[in-house]
Amino acid sequence: SLEEQLFYRYFRPAKEKEDGEWLSPAEILEDIKKNSAIPLSNKRVSVFGRVLRKHEIPSKRVHRGTVYHVVRVL
């Protein structure tokens, strides 16, 4: 999917002991929107969250929802 391609263009899953960032799907999507010329609506956030879960990106629940452990590629 477009979301999967964009995620792997700008991010990758963090390895177990690696420093990375814990970001929500909305934060990841916002970062991708800033860096790509492809318009993405905020309605895609829930779709994007499902994509991250499907790819088993490391995650944890926090007070603001689920965040994912990622590393920026670019």
Predicted stretch roles:
Residues 1-74:
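DNA transaction DNA-binding modules
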